[in-house]
Amino acid sequence: MKRLAFFAAAVLTISGCQRAGAPALVRIGSKNFSEQVLLAEIVAQALEAKGLRVDRRLNLGGTFVCHKALVAGDLDLYPEYTGTAFTAILAKKPVADPAAVRKEVEGEYAKRWGVVWSPALGFENTFALVVRGEDARRWGLKTISDLRAHEAEIRPGFGYEFLEREDGFPGLARTYGLEFPRRPAQMDLGLLYPALESHQVDLIAGNSTDGLIAALGAAVLEDDRHYFPPYEAAFVVRGQVWKTNAAVREALERLGGKISADTMRKLNARLDRDKRRPEDVAKEFLKTLSSLSS
């Protein structure tokens, strides 16, 4: 019996040593749209190249799902936008100053949840009200204010978050005095552009870096009353992970300022227009980034 107990203890000790010596596991999440999945995949591959193990938890859902998973310790990092954090998570009124928004979200996230913001990736992805190009020309639509003259004819279709968030449709309607007779249809994000193209809806709330805008010949309406706050893209990271995992810090710092809005639109187009796999697009981007850095 003593020999058996000694053997069991030895096995536990050995297995514990194996776990301790194993590469760190990093859990990366994303929201449920193409750009988010791609950004998460880019960081996942960058970390795997450094020898880390990655648990991909992609397409989780919207902002609140990802945020709750992060602060609960179920995720280590995911891509986020400063304006989204400012208005949706911190429940603050939209502010136009990018530096002020960044400072506020950095401070509040650190104080409330011990979460760190990585360096900005180099682009903003703001909400964008999008119409078919033919309708923009036919109705003379250039700005969001122009919609008021055609409210009775327009069938809006929006995602759940845009319908509910303060920096989404509720505040937008108040700011611009919009009163659509037809209640906006609530749609899955992946269905917005197909619905617009097939004339099921006439107006959608997309994102300024969506690759399908140019591909479909759609038109983005100017936010002439400057309603939407800045939405600088970055990663939010659990403080303990940022502090103790040098590979995570190095990967995110290396990405800082490296993705312009034009680059992000082109990458998104490869996913949504060309139907490429996020894994392949991420691999190509990292290869290009490596060649530029060498």
Residue ranges and their predicted role:
Residues I14-G16:
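C-terminal motif of bacterial Sec signal peptides marking the signal peptidase cleavage site
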Residues Q18-A20:
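Bacterial signal peptide processing site
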Residues V71-E80, E151-R155, G171, A195-G206:
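Alpha-to-beta junction loops
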Residues N59-T63, G73-F86, V101-R102, R132, ...:
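Beta->alpha turn/N-cap motifs
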Residues E35, L163, D167-G168, A173-T175, ...:
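An extracytoplasmic/periplasmic, membrane-proximal ligand-sensing/linker region
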Residues I89-S118, S198-V201, L212-H226:
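Ligand-binding "clamshell"
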Residues P23-D55, L121-P194, R276-D280:
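Bilobed "Venus flytrap"/periplasmic-binding protein-like clamshell domains
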Residues F127-R137, E232-N245:
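A bilobed periplasmic-binding-protein/Venus flytrap-type ligand-binding module shared by bacterial periplasmic
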